């Protein structure tokens, strides 16, 4: 079973929708990584922390975050650790 088949089945969406969702989530992850990498002030970190709390706790986002070989494995460890420390433990077991 392909990754997009898994996403499709888990989320109740078509395989085409799963493909689009997967790559859209990756674009957001990379955007957030860029924001993290360019943080300068505590306000920057606070803003990004709020985004991560809301965005990464969505079940579809969690599914991609935890299963895509282009998400956590492709991002810098500092950013992955930053996200992992923020998201709620009950959602990290996907």
Where are these regions (language model features)?
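Amphipathic alpha-helical "stem/stalk" segments
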Residues: 1-94
